[in-house]
């Protein structure tokens, strides 16, 4: 295939093309996707936890460098825009979207998370009134059923690892490229998570966890990798 040329840095302040909508959030904000020019082989999404904005920043910077659509990769910059604009891990209804997917282990109730990586996991959020109770969750499920990507990369922070339950070649290459540990799980149970939902459906899901670092360090470390993922189907 012909290599995708990158825009000059002076043009990185804006998007060359506009996204389409695949739904709306609880607050009515469009859920946006940049679709590939060809068959969707890979979906990369960021910002399902609004308190992890560095994932959105990095993926946005990578996407803004392209002169044309990715040939193979769909991009979602903010799977939880309500949480992103409010600075909360959950959505506007206080639901952790990454515990709201209809998995065999989903349970109603609350789930905890850490306020900072150094604190105990004691901050409460809801898992939702029922599995897939949230519009953001349902929209992402419907989108994936339509796109039928061969794999999904979910961007998170700050656990500093490549989490791939399938130990796939793509996950292994990503770990080598980023110098992040390659693990089969993050060390604790995640009922109702997107990764579990994908696994139950035979959809390979790789969780790309950024390390705890300054924003500029994050951009330095991860934007070039994301550009490669967007432009090179053989990554």
Predicted feature descriptions by range:
Residues 19, 33, 75, 152, ...:
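Conserved beta-strand scaffold positions in the cores of enzyme catalytic domains, especially
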Residues 39-43, 52-186:
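Active-site/substrate-binding loop(s) of hydrolase catalytic cores
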Residues 46:
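Glycine-rich N-terminal segment of FAD-binding domains in flavoprotein oxidoreductases
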Residues 164, 190-235:
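Active-site-adjacent mobile loop/cap segments within catalytic or ligand-binding domains
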């Amino acid at each position: 295939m012909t290599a995708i040329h990158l825009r000059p840095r002076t043009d990185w302040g804006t998007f060359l093309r506009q996204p389409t909508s695949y739904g709306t959030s609880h607050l009515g904000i469009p859920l946006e996707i940049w679709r590939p020019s060809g068959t969707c082989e890979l979906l990369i999404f960021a910002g399902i936890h609004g308190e992890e904005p560095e994932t959105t920043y990095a993926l946005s910077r990578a996407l803004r460098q392209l002169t044309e659509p990715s040939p193979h990769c769909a991009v979602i910059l903010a799977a939880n825009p309500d949480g992103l604009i409010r600075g909360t891990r959950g959505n506007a209804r206080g639901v952790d979207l990454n515990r709201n997917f209809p998995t065999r282990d989903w349970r109603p109730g609350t789930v905890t998370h850490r306020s900072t990586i150094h604190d105990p996991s004691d901050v409460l959020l809801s898992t939702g009134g029922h599995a897939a109770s949230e519009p953001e969750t349902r929209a992402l499920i419907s989108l994936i059923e339509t796109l039928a990507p061969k794999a999904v990369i979910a961007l998170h922070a700050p656990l500093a690892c490549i989490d791939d339950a399938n130990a796939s070649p793509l996950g292994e290459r990503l770990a080598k490229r980023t110098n992040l540990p390659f693990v089969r799980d993050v060390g604790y149970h995640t009922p109702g998570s997107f990764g579990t939902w994908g696994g139950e459906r035979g959809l390979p899901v790789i969780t790309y966890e950024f390390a705890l670092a300054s924003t500029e360090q994050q951009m330095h470390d991860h934007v070039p990798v994301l550009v490669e993922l967007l432009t090179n189907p053989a990554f």
